[in-house]
UniProtKB/Swiss-Prot annotation:
Source species of the chain: Mirabilis jalapa
Descriptive protein name: Antiviral protein MAP
One Pfam family recorded for the sequence: RIP
Entry-linked SUPFAM superfamilies: Ribosome inactivating proteins (RIP)
PROSITE patterns, A to Z: SHIGA_RICIN (PS00275)
Reported function: Inhibits viral infection of plants, and protein synthesis in vitro.
Enzyme Commission number, as recorded: 3.2.2.22
Keyword Transcription: no
Family annotation (Gene3D superfamilies): Ricin (A subunit), domain 1, Ricin (A Subunit), domain 2
Cysteines paired by S-S bonds: 64-248
GO biological process: defense response to virus; negative regulation of translation
Amino acid sequence: MLTTTKVFFLLLTTWITWYAIVNPQSRAAPTLETIASLDLNNPTTYLSFITNIRTKVADKTEQCTIQKISKTFTQRYSYIDLIVSSTQKITLAIDMADLYVLGYSDIANNKGRAFFFKDVTEAVANNFFPGATGTNRIKLTFTGSYGDLEKNGGLRKDNPLGIFRLENSIVNIYGKAGDVKKQAKFFLLAIQMVSEAARFKYISDKIPSEKYEEVTVDEYMTALENNWAKLSTAVYNSKPSTTTATKCQLATSPVTISPWIFKTVEEIKLVMGLLKSS
């Protein structure tokens, strides 16, 4: 026969289990590392910010003398901070395995708030931003694909990249009611100036170090952004070589992603910051 104490603990355990099922956000989220922070008032630190990101996600070994994203992480998810001031900071939710941005957090009405792309599952979202709870955890109506972002925020070529542009996009959304167009514009800038810049030296080198300067996203940049996997695969599939600087030779040459034509691994290395994990 169950004692009163045993009955109590049985009921308590049952309630805790039920509560965790119907309130998944109540489960403790892991403590995630902030792998890099960018102070938008100090734009000269931008390239070191990008270098820090590459260092955090890079494998210990290289492929054809090119850094590559690691296959394994102690923690797969992390944060990256974009700082406007002591009272305005956007924190990006990052998947370390590919540097995908999954969402962001800010403060609204003195409470933590988080937005996630439409295609981010609840199981993944629950790893991030434990300070944002209940109705302050919001699923966006669009995904993180460039197709969705450009549909809602304008074409990449019409959204120049620059430190002030990024700062202004944060000011436009921080603590304010969700606005699809403004949020999509923010993501277009943040994804290209953080994730794509870490993936491609060509892009990171294009971002001006002066706060009020900007660069138009041209067809060379979008071609790289749309073909990271293709270029990475070409490097992984290359053959050993004793005559090239990278010790590698493309198995199939050239690799064409219009308007780019890459005839050697060395040419790919010139634009690449990180290879996609194999």
